[in-house]
Amino acid sequence: MELNWEFDRYLASIYRSSGYLHCIEEIEFIDFKEFVGLEKEIALLCQNTQSFLSNKECVNVLLWGARGCGKSSLIKALLGKYAKEGLRVLQILKQDLQKIPEIFDYLRNKPYKFIIFCDDLSFDRDEKEYKVLKTFLEGSIEAFPKNILIYATSNRRHLLQQFHDENEIFGFEGDEDKIALSDRFPLCIGFYSYGHKEYLEVLAQCFKKSNIYDEFAHIQQKAINYATQKGSKSPRIAKQFFKLYQSGLIDIL
């Protein structure tokens, strides 16, 4: 596997299964001001990332919780804020986790700081990729690179699907394996479902940003109905509604 990345030109890349880094030309950066009700979560992430960039003590991070609540978007916000200080992001998919050793070897001595971003990370019973991740988070004989952190997102607190095998001793072995993976993330930040107020606040931001806030009051009930149909009041659903509104499709639904 031969990896290439022009770090000065590209702020982020995605590892492709065929064995190369796809450098990202366009990134949809997000400002921290756009997040609603996540002040504590943002403060924790920024403090850890600032410590990382300053060569101070820092830790790998697991962002877990409700879908569509901004976990992945926060990584883009971090990159937008800290790219000028040498931060770069490499995204890797679950099925490619076995390539982490080669990726570490490639990045270890580069004059940048890297967040390895694992999005929507969770494992079912028969999947074994988590063992590679568990080893390299803590357990390898080789020291973890000082210029790399892993930030992962998941809908599951413990990453592995809960199950008990009849061959386990009272089921404890499976639980221990499951918990051992999440334990390797010293900082676990939980994200919870938005309520009515937060949902409308996110939507209001969208209208303000597009200079059409005067239209917001007339559309709130439709927005609430849409969230009910989707079964969620997350920021993702609010932004989906806004796109439908702008396209005129919301009047047809």
Predicted regions mapped to residue ranges:
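A short, basic N-terminal segment
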Residues: 1-51, 235, 239-253
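Conserved catalytic/switch belt of AAA+ P-loop NTPases
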Residues: 125-166
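AAA+/P-loop NTPase substrate/partner-engagement loops
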Residues: 81-114, 121-126
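Conserved nucleotide-binding/hydrolysis micro-motifs of P-loop NTPases
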Residues: 95-98, 121-124, 150, 154-160, ...
